[in-house]
A protein has these predicted regions:
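Glycine-rich cofactor/substrate-binding loops
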Residues: 1-34, 62, 85-89, 282-284, ...
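Generic, well-ordered alpha-helical scaffold segments in large soluble proteins
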Residues: 43-47, 99, 103, 138, ...
Length: 456
């Protein structure tokens, strides 16, 4: 069978392939090879820039242009050639080195220094920076826009439903009213906080040899300040430098990044479930799409499939994120190879996240608030006004206010007339009774509207 959307084992490349297209140039085998080529080329150019390494003299404009072109024009044919070389070497990074030596043969200046491709490097020097570039690119160019869009949509809903009263539910039971807008604002604020943490994670890199001590570097060029040279190189890639490592960059930052994304995802799961519940209660209707079928046997159904799809994919994403975050920082002594196969799954967790983000956004686009259903829910639960009444009773020194309201309301339905009759029995100033009688479940929303207004 040829690989296609129909034959792919993973739904990321199969059923949901079009939703993960943005990740293919980053996390695929092609993407990894492309970043490896970039790191190897930039290392050679960096060596040529140092006067203390005379065997690699400063490169001419033509030589630099050729090297830059290898990076910028890297294509699938180049990647296929590397894989062909790997069938002989049985070593993926060495195959990249040999590929580059082939590419520079046409330029005598570069051919003369071709043995300085991969100079003093362990494979992990190339790989860790490549993984760093993969994650930085994915975060900044793919994850960030989706996070921003989700937060923006939640803020839009918050302001759109600012004045729409909602019966809250704690423990699944009727509770103090809020507004639908304020509930959306809660989620927007939570997501925004985690998004800031995602973007604040420093993505690290190192290039310091087989065990992190520049052993090979110093043996060849003891006069060069390799510590400083390493920092300059890593930061030139747009990464943050890690000066203390074993053979591998210890991947702590990957755990930090994935834990932050997983928290963002967990909040989104919470949102998906809440909206699912609001749809079940009738508080939200879903705009139908012509031709769509909700159930193979029940023609009337319009199911909350987008939120369910999102919840499922976020669960998968977080399961992978959690394994990566707990496994990658652990490596026996100066390194073992267990991280190598695990690192090939960076895009899996991000892929499931991306599918979920798009599903949530699609679900949001179909939502239509059902103000009538929310109003009916509130009007059927006047007992929620027990809270403000007993609180005012406390202010005016009436004994056992909580207990009196508990006796009136617990396990009972109380209508507007019953609540007002109870207020009349209280020893309160007349103007206070008048104000209490003005309360309804729909207007007892505290500062919910102001809190939406304060959302930036």
């Amino acid at each position: 069978m040829e690989l296609s959307a129909l034959t792919a084992v993973s739904p990321i490349d199969g059923r949901y392939g079009d939703k993960a297209d943005a990740l293919r140039p980053i996390f695929s085998e092609f993407g990894l090879l492309r970043f490896r080529v970039e790191v190897e080329v930039r290392w050679l150019q960096k060596l040529a820039s140092h006067v203390g390494i005379p065997e690699v003299p400063a490169l001419s404009a033509a030589a630099n242009a050729l090297l830059d072109g290898i990076v910028s024009n890297f294509n699938e044919s180049d990647a296929a050639r590397i894989k062909q070389i790997e069938r002989t070497t049985n070593h993926d990074v060495k195959a990249v080195e040999y590929f580059l030596k082939e590419k520079v043969e046409v330029n005598p200046e570069l051919a003369a220094v071709s043995e300085f491709i991969h100079f003093a490097c362990t494979s992990e020097d190339i790989n860790n920076n490549s993984h760093g570039l993969m994650l930085k690119t994915a975060r900044d160019e793919v994850i960030k826009p989706y996070c921003e869009k989700l937060i923006s949509e939640l803020k839009r809903l918050a302001h759109e439903y600012r004045d729409m009263p909602l019966l809250s539910r704690t423990h699944g039971q009727p509770a103090t009213p809020s507004t639908m807008g304020k509930e959306m604002a809660n989620v927007a604020y939570r997501l925004e906080r985690q998004f800031k943490q995602i973007m604040a994670v420093e993505i690290l890199g190192k290039i310091n040899g087989a065990v992190g001590n520049y052993n090979a570097h110093v043996s060849a060029y003891p006069e060069v300040d390799w510590h400083q040279f390493s920092e300059e190189f890593v930061t030139s890639l747009g990464l943050n430098w890690n000066p203390y490592t074993t053979q591998i960059e210890p991947h702590d930052y990957i755990a930090e990044l994935f834990d932050a994304i997983a928290r963002f995802n967990t909040i989104l799961i919470d949102f998906d479930r809440d909206v699912w519940g609001y749809i079940s209660l009738g508080h939200f209707k879903q705009r139908t799409v012509a031709g769509e079928i909700g159930s193979s046997t029940m023609p009337h159904k319009v199911n909350p499939i987008d939120f369910e799809n999102s919840e499922g994919n976020l669960g998968l994403a977080n399961a992978v994120f959690q394994h990566l975050a707990s496994k990658l920082p652990i490596s026996r002594w100066q390194r073992d190879l267990t991280d190598s196969t695990v690192l090939r799954n960076l895009g899996v967790a991000v892929g499931y996240s991306l599918i979920a983000y798009q599903a949530t956004l699609k679900g949001i686009s179909k939502l239509e608030a059902n103000a009538g259903a929310m109003a009916a829910d509130l009007d059927a639960n006047w007992e929620v006004l027990a809270e403000p009444i007993q609180t005012v009773m406390r202010r005016y020194g009436i004994e056992k206010p909580y207990e009196k309201l508990k006796e009136l309301t617990r396990g009972r339905r109380v209508d507007a007339e019953g609540m007002r009759t109870f207020i009349d029995t209280l020893e309160l100033p007349e103007h206070v009774k008048v104000e209490l009688k003005k309360l309804t479940p729909a207007n007892y929303i505290g500062q919910a509207q102001r809190l939406v207004d304060l959302l930036k």
